Structures are given as structure tokens and as C-alpha cells.
UniProtKB/Swiss-Prot annotation:
Its main location: mitochondrion. GO terms for cellular component: membrane; mitochondrion. The record marks 9 as: Participates in a stacking interaction with the uracil ring of UDP-GlcNAc. This is Probable UDP-3-O-acylglucosamine N-acyltransferase 2, mitochondrial. The gene is LPXD2.
Length: 304
């Protein structure tokens, strides 16, 4: 950075620019955007290409800012990742080498993006969110202080097809987004599909284990717990404080009210309208499920 500024100074590119750079910090550390920002841009030659940057005064937000590595993409100075020149990234955000941030993405203050991660166009990530390695995020907004573990995929198309009048398999359009609230944690290799007729939503403080599948148009309330290998089909609505045990399944287009606990390996095939504990296939109130198990053991002359 010092060498670049010195070359700008020695070549006398712009006298007014010299005064701005020498008398003001290059990046101010404020976290809030100002509607009265003004832009400062500069360029200089380098052995890797032309270095370009655009800095908004009165804010820590920055677009561009590094060595050009491909048309429209720059090497981000904090971590060495590759970022599109139109992406808006706070100077305190860390984008590790090997990560890619696409056009018009927004990364808030103190965001950490791990190597191999791809942040798609127009993705919005809130402050202090940590994203692991080899994550794919597209068509999505993520709130503050979230944790996204390695291998997560968010915002890809949901599984929607139909057979037309000619017998051809046709894909249903998947055009909406995923909206993730604040302080959400998503375990490794979990997949969350984008919406088709409504957004896929995960509300604040929900925690999701590894290897969970969440289909398109699903709405999950706040403070829910989803254990490993849970599968939720499309267009499901889940209330607040719901806990789904490991390998539990929920069929499409059903609703689960708040404060429900579902036992491991259970399957919800119809709406659950009252809070409580449920289990079995199909899921029923837990005491009924236990009676079913006892009857089955007696019928088969097994010891209880």
C-alpha cells in the first residue's frame, strides 16, 4: 500500500488526490453507511496489472481495492481472496485466499469468508458472520453473527418438476431467495433451497446440525433445533422453539406449531396443531407411539 501511494505521489497524477490521501485515513473505521458519501478512485501500474480501488468517505465500506486478477475481479487486500469490483465489502472483512465474491455482493464488518467459498451475486451478509471453507451461497441474505460451517450450500434451486402434456419432464421455476436471521448456526454440508412461490426463511437463533436438507419455501421459526440428517420437504411451516431429532422427516405442505419436539427417526405426514412430544411413523403423540411399540412387541411375543 505504501509503495502504491508513493508511485501515485511521484507521478503527480492528481494534486487534489495527493492532498486527500496525505491528510485523511485511507479507510475510516465507521460501520454505518452514510447517505452523503463521496467516492475516491485511483489506479496505478503493477507487475500483476492495474490496481484499482474505490473508497467511500465517512464509512468503512469499500468497493474494489486490490490487484486485478481477472476482468472485473480484484485481489482483496485483507486475506487475498478474489472480489468483484462492484461488491461492497467493509475493510474489516476477511476474505481468505481462494474465496470468490461476485458482483454486487455485500459483506458487513468483521465478516470472515473461508478459502474455497463462493459468494454469489447480490448476496447480503451481515456483520460478524463467519463462513467456513468450501461454502456456496447464492440468492440469499444472512443476518448478523451467524456461523456457516464447511461445505454448506444455500440458495440453489429447489427440487420441483412436473410432467407436461407431451410427457416431458419440465423444471418448475425457482426464482426467489433464502432469508436467514441473526445468530443462526448451520452445520457442515447442510443444504437450503431457494424459494419458488415464497422465500425460504430461517428465523433468529435457530441452530441446524450437519447434513440437514431444507427444501424450497420452508419457513422455520426462531430458536429451533434441527439435529443431524433431518429432512424437511418443500413448503413446510415450522413454528418457534421446535426440536427435530436426528433423521426426522417432514413431508411437504404440512405445518408444525411452536414448542413441538419430534423423536429421532420419526416422520410427520400431517399437520401438528398442538405443542408437545411426538414420535413414530406417522408421527403421533409420544405416549400413543409408545403404546404402539408395546402392542407390536406383544403381538410378536417379544419380551418387553
Amino acid at each position: 500500500m505504501a509503495a502504491t501511494l508513493w508511485r501515485l505521489y511521484s507521478k503527480s497524477i492528481c494534486n487534489s488526490l495527493q492532498g486527500i490521501i496525505l491528510n485523511k485515513p485511507f479507510i475510516q473505521k465507521q460501520l454505518l453507511l452514510s447517505s452523503r458519501t463521496r467516492s475516491l478512485s485511483f489506479s496505478s501500474d503493477s507487475q500483476f496489472g492495474s490496481a484499482t480501488a474505490e473508497v467511500c468517505s465517512n464509512t468503512g465500506l469499500k468497493t474494489g481495492g486490490g490487484i486485478i486478477v481477472k476482468e472485473g475481479f480484484l485481489r482483496w487486500e485483507n486475506g487475498g481472496g478474489t472480489c468483484h469490483s462492484s461488491a461492497q465489502i467493509y475493510s474489516s472483512a476477511l476474505v481468505e485466499f481462494g474465496a470468490v465474491v461476485h458482483e454486487k455482493a455485500v459483506l458487513g464488518a468483521e465478516v470472515h469468508v473461508g478459502s474455497g467459498t463462493v459468494i454469489g451475486p447480490s448476496v447480503d451478509i451481515g456483520p460478524s458472520t463467519r463462513i467456513g471453507y468450501n461454502v456456496s451461497i447464492s440468492n440469499c441474505s444472512i443476518g448478523d453473527s451467524c456461523v456457516i460451517h464447511n461445505g454448506v450450500c444455500i440458495g440453489q434451486d429447489g427440487f420441483g418438476f412436473y410432467v407436461d402434456e407431451h410427457g416431458n419432464m419440465v423444471k418448475k421455476p425457482q426464482t426467489l431467495n433464502v432469508k436467514i436471521g441473526n445468530r443462526v448456526e448451520i452445520g457442515a454440508n447442510t443444504c437450503i433451497d431457494r424459494g419458488s412461490w415464497r422465500e425460504t426463511v430461517i428465523e433468529d437463533d435457530t441452530k441446524i446440525d450437519n447434513l440437514v436438507q431444507i427444501g424450497h419455501n420452508v419457513i422455520i421459526g426462531k430458536c429451533c433445533l434441527l439435529c443431524g440428517q433431518v429432512g424437511i420437504a418443500g413448503s413446510v411451516t415450522i413454528g418457534d422453539y421446535v426440536a427435530l431429532g436426528g433423521r426426522a422427516a417432514v413431508r411437504d405442505h404440512v405445518s408444525i406449531v411452536s414448542k413441538v419436539r419430534l423423536a429421532a427417526n420419526s416422520c410427520v405426514t400431517r399437520n401438528i396443531t398442538e405443542p408437545g412430544d411426538f414420535g413414530g411413523f406417522p408421527a403421533v403423540p409420544i405416549h400413543e407411539w409408545r403404546k404402539q411399540i408395546v402392542r407390536a412387541q406383544i403381538a410378536n411375543k417379544r419380551e418387553i
